[in-house]
Design a protein with these regions (language model features):
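N-terminal Rossmann-like dinucleotide-binding module
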Residues: 1-49, 171
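A contiguous active-site-proximal alpha/beta segment in oxidoreductase catalytic domains
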Residues: 97-154
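Active-site loop of classical SDR/Rossmann-like NAD(P)-dependent oxidoreductases
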Residues: 37, 261-275, 289
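Beta-loop-alpha module in the N-terminal Rossmann-like domain of NAD(P)-dependent dehydrogenases
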Residues: 19, 49-107
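Contiguous beta-strand/loop segments that form the cofactor/metal-binding neighborhood of enzyme cores
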Residues: 168-241, 271-285, 321-330
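Mid-domain beta-loop-alpha active-site segment that forms a flexible
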Residues: 120-127, 150-181, 293-294
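Hydrophobic residues in well-ordered beta-strands that form the structural core
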Residues: 55, 92, 117-119, 143, ...
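C-terminal helix-rich "cap/oligomerization" subdomain common to oxidoreductases
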Residues: 1, 66-68, 276-330
Length: 330
């Protein structure tokens, strides 16, 4: 292997462009080319970064050892599969695929080919998220909120697969227990898919997690609160700050609470994610967000989607019945 890992970015949309920029600037990797079925779009990115552009990613086989797969979700499986079959290590954007069968197939293929398969759950690479994992011991209750103004992106999927899956993945990494029950409710607002959702997860160890995500908001807010024996943690992902409250005294009657505020430097999470992927390829070690973990997050997100869609159908049916009743009674 050369000094720099030869890589390509497959898919030069919004996220793919960022991937290409980070890889081009990396001292550990060489951006060999970018690929997109929309050649003009790929050429625009390639020209800015000084690399060739192709419309068929297969033209790059034999020239690269790793790839960022940043195509639309429904194409994740086909593109990642062909790369893995050729022994190319893959960093695939979240969610890993759009179904469990295809996710399982990718994980198995990566293992068989001894390739690194990393899933792009970006939140894991923020400084405050790394600190959070050091402080969380036995979570009893988790409350998570992720809301943002409407961007018009990722409207081909609901808000669970667009935004909430980030927090589902983080919660699953904090709670070492199987999921016992799952329910979700929400509604479509600006798109044909649900744009807001609140999900409630009950784990076998008794922990409860409530996760809210919305892509229809007047502001951006990303926070999480974790309650565990003798301590409470509040995370603000926007300001990269962590507040920790602990019982300062002994005994049930003790009222003193010790509060500590921690702030973390704003880091380039995507740069760290790509750097971690490159290190895993070079050192042959398991990624922070492996294919298996990406699959687990997808499974939970699909359960949430199923519950969410059932709720939406119920609301629509009730609204339709009420409308008919008003019409008959008029």
């Amino acid at each position: 292997m050369s000094d720099k890992l030869p890589m390509a970015v497959i898919g030069t949309g919004h996220f793919g462009t960022y991937h290409a920029q980070k890889i081009a600037a990396s001292e550990q990797a060489e951006l060999v080319a970018v690929a997109d079925i929309d050649l003009a779009r790929a050429e625009a990115v390639g020209e800015r970064l000084g690399v060739p552009a192709v419309s068929d990613f297969r033209e790059l086989f034999g020239k690269i050892d790793a790839a960022s797969v940043t195509v639309p979700t429904q194409a994740h499986f086909d593109v990642a599969r062909e790369c893995l079959e050729r022994g190319i290590h893959v960093l695939v954007e979240k969610p890993i695929t759009d179904g469990l069968a295809t996710a399982d197939a990718l994980v198995e293929l990566a293992n068989n080919r001894e390739c690194i398969l990393q899933v792009g759950h970006l939140v894991r690479f923020s400084g405050v998220a790394e600190a959070l994992r050091r402080h969380v011991t036995r979570p009893l209750y988790i409350d998570s909120v992720r809301i943002a103004p409407f961007s018009g992106r990722s409207t081909d999927v609901n808000v669970v697969l667009d935004l909430m899956i980030h927090d589902i993945d983080l919660v699953l990494s904090l709670v070492d227990s199987p999921i016992l029950a799952f329910d979700a409710a929400g509604a479509p607002v600006f798109t044909d898919h649900e744009d807001i959702c609140t999900a409630r997860i009950k784990f076998a160890n008794g922990c409860i997690a409530t996760i809210t995500a919305s892509r229809i908001s007047f502001k951006t807010e990303r926070r999480m609160r974790i309650f565990q024996p003798s301590s409470y943690l509040s995370v603000n992902f926007d300001s990269q700050s962590l507040s920790i409250a602990r019982r300062a005294g002994d005994g049930v009657s003790a009222t003193a609470v010790d509060i500590r505020e921690e702030s973390y430097e704003e880091v380039d999470a995507l740069e760290r994610e790509i750097g971690a992927f490159i290190a895993c390829v070079r050192e042959g070690r398991r990624p922070i967000v492996s294919g298996e973990e990406g699959r687990r997050a997808l499974e939970a997100a699909l359960i949430a989607t199923r519950e969410l869609q059932a709720h939406t159908r119920f609301v629509m049916e009730v609204s339709s019945d009420q409308g008919l009743a008003r019409k008959v009674g008029s």
